[in-house]
Amino acid sequence: MAAFSYGLYHSSRKTLSGVKTSVTNDWLDNATHKALFNSEYEARTFLGTLDAAFMIAYATGLFFWGWLGDRLNPKYVIATGMVGSGVMLTLFGAFPKWFDFYNAAYYVLTYLLFGLMQACGWPSEIAIMANWFGKANRGFVMGVWASCQPLGNVFGSFFTSWILPFGYENAFFMNGLLMLIGAFVVMISIDPKPKETQYSQLHNEESGERSHAVEGEPIKILDAILLPGVLAYCLCNACLKLVNYAFFFWLPLYLTEAYHWEETTADQLSIWYDIGGIIGSVVGGYISDKLGCRAPLIVAMLICSIGSLFVYAHIGAHMIWNAFFMTVVGVTVSGPYNLIVGTISIDLGSQPILAANAQAMSTVSGLLDGTGSAGSAIGQILVPIMQNSLGWESVFYLFMLLNTLAICCIMKRCVMDLKPWLSSISSSPELSPLLNDSPHEE
């Protein structure tokens, strides 16, 4: 059910991405109201501003909700975010159309609040998954589970394209309604931790022997940043999430403008990027379990992403080839992103230095995804500016540069992971999933 709930989170985010052409046309040319913008350039720039506003609020919210998720029942945090997201999505996209109320400040405010509510989900979802699953096959388990993000995108793309002929405002309303239904399902079906863990904690509390070694104290954000490996992956994710979310926000519009395809066709074709993300997440998690380390695999995938981005930028309007290389880009961009925010979040939040402190997980995952969202916020402003000034090709070169920087951020971690892995080929000792107890690690 955790995968179901976060899939709905992602599905609701996909709404604006799938209707940008319709929304732009409504802002520019409508008999019922004065045009909100004077040119398509202004409208597109404002769309980038909205995406950036969402990511800024989302990044800020991740730090807060991650901190709060270690102090409250994570199920309640998830449900609160779903209710708030459903309400804000309807107010943002449906309310202006229904009541002919078009105001730029109103759009920014409601989308900021939507981003803040969306941030409730991920840290608490990760905390729940960490309670239910241990180290065994963590890469594969979390790879499968983290695929709920691209699966949610796929569902959101299809659902939005299906509703779009009835009016883009109804796409916002129906996705908002799904979030409200999902919140109810979460409240009645999710257990934050296994029953035996709850019984054990209750027994310890009744006998006055509460185990601080298991629960621990909630960790401070600054202390979380200084944990081994956290800062490197935060910086890596700031670059990688910018690229991943640029595809998330702009891919349907790119397909519509670059190849003059219908908006519904572009929405449906864009799912191949998310299908690639599912493949990369699941297969990457499985391979990383077999390798006994994560960073070398992520570096290899990111190196491949640079070539796949270059090819995709020049692939042309042939739908089959476009879909194929879009899938390859999804494998090499969305795949490692899912591994970082999923599997590696748990690895970093449960490393030996924390002494099994279960109260650190949500904070660490919120920090990791929050810094990624901060980087992504910058990207959503850069994309329309670069596209308007230099064309779409320049945007893809920006993506290649950012993925190169992402590689640099974790190269030290990669080298450290490779040393014991290479030595293990001959000796075959038992390996930890990600983190080694090396004293020189930073």
Q: Positions of the model-derived regions?
A:
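Extracytoplasmic gate region of multi-pass secondary transporters
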Residues: 14-21, 227-284, 337-342, 378-380
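Extracellular/periplasmic helix-loop-helix junction of adjacent transmembrane segments
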Residues: 20-59
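Cytoplasmic membrane-interface "Motif A"-like loop-to-helix N-cap segments
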Residues: 71-82, 289-303
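C-terminal ends and interior cores of transmembrane alpha-helices
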Residues: 83-101, 303-317
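Hydrophobic core of transmembrane alpha-helices in multi-pass small-molecule transporters
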Residues: 88, 100-120, 320-350
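Cytoplasmic helix-loop-helix junction between adjacent transmembrane helices
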Residues: 110-149
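Helix-loop-helix hairpin linking two adjacent transmembrane segments in secondary transporters
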Residues: 145-194
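Symmetry-related core transmembrane helices of the 12-TM Major Facilitator Superfamily/SLC fold
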Residues: 170-188, 394-413
